[in-house]
């Protein structure tokens, strides 16, 4: 296969389809989404079987546990994909919405209209759910998309792509609005990220190595995040019961996700009572705690205790490992977070309203939380229906990226024959 020519043809078809999608009406887009959701539920057994083929191959190839976790398509994950599409159906269609209208002294009326970005390239690894989430959001936002999933999920992705095509056809929308790159040749990625004439934005969903490569080589703008180094700070005004629940859930709910806590910060005044109680919870999951000197002094006797190195504060483990640091107060906590955080998601546990509001203002992350687990940093949980990714950049989109993040604004001007003098 001539990869360059193949990807050029994919891009040309996507560009043509994007023009049709930009003018598709809401009813047709919603019909396609509903048909895809119904097909996912109908063919759940087929999807599980395809996923099992991928999982067997992945284990034989020594895929790491965090990636295996992401690759697994459970019954709940299948149901969540369908529910996510139905949530997107229920969301208002942003395309064509005009806002900020105002009259100018010259007599013209100026506003902004929300429009699709055009063609969105999605590059992802062992995440079959991304196939559906991305397709759904791109369809509703009037975009075309080119999906390049990892070879680990090729059978499951192909099964899902078939259902997406079925839904598009049933709604009278162009089949090329959602295209799966059929080859697993990595050269296809290189072509996709260097076709600005056909692709308007790239959204990578994968490990640090993938993102770093794309940052160096892409000629197309990206919506991305590099790391998920998330913090929970337990303030000395925290409710202990809330602190235990949040700090345990943020770490142990799932290890292999970008919104999992990697560093726990504890106020010195509450550390002697809260840390031993937390350690008992972490021991039930064999979590390794890497603490600073003060934390290790409090945690003496914990079975899985190690000294934290300077590198630990800036490490995304994606595993049953947690860095623990004792801080004097919120000033030190905020300083640590803004120094080491990847600007993804950080949370404070406190009953002090003033401190909570200050934490919201001063922590420079895409999602900042009060008395909630970092695991809530997710488009589905935020009511976006699904997310196409999470951005910790500050331009265009920040945080979980839903429908609005896949659109831009153009100026529209209404006149009555005015000319400029």
UniProtKB/Swiss-Prot annotation:
Pfam families: Aldedh (PF00171). GO terms for molecular function: glutamate-5-semialdehyde dehydrogenase activity; NADP binding. One of its GO terms (biological process) is L-proline biosynthetic process. It is found in: Cytoplasm. It comes from the Bacteria. Pathway: Amino-acid biosynthesis; L-proline biosynthesis; L-glutamate 5-semialdehyde from L-glutamate: step 2/2. GO terms for cellular component: cytoplasm. Gene3D superfamilies: Aldehyde Dehydrogenase, Chain A, domain 1, Aldehyde Dehydrogenase, Chain A, domain 2. The keyword Amino-acid biosynthesis applies. It catalyses: L-glutamate 5-semialdehyde + phosphate + NADP(+) = L-glutamyl 5-phosphate + NADPH + H(+). Its EC number is 1.2.1.41. Its main location: cytoplasm. Disulfide bonds: none annotated. Keywords: Amino-acid biosynthesis, Cytoplasm, NADP, Oxidoreductase, Proline biosynthesis. Catalyzes the NADPH-dependent reduction of L-glutamate 5-phosphate into L-glutamate 5-semialdehyde and phosphate. The product spontaneously undergoes cyclization to form 1-pyrroline-5-carboxylate. Belongs to the gamma-glutamyl phosphate reductase family. This is Gamma-glutamyl phosphate reductase. It comes from Herminiimonas arsenicoxydans. The gene is proA.
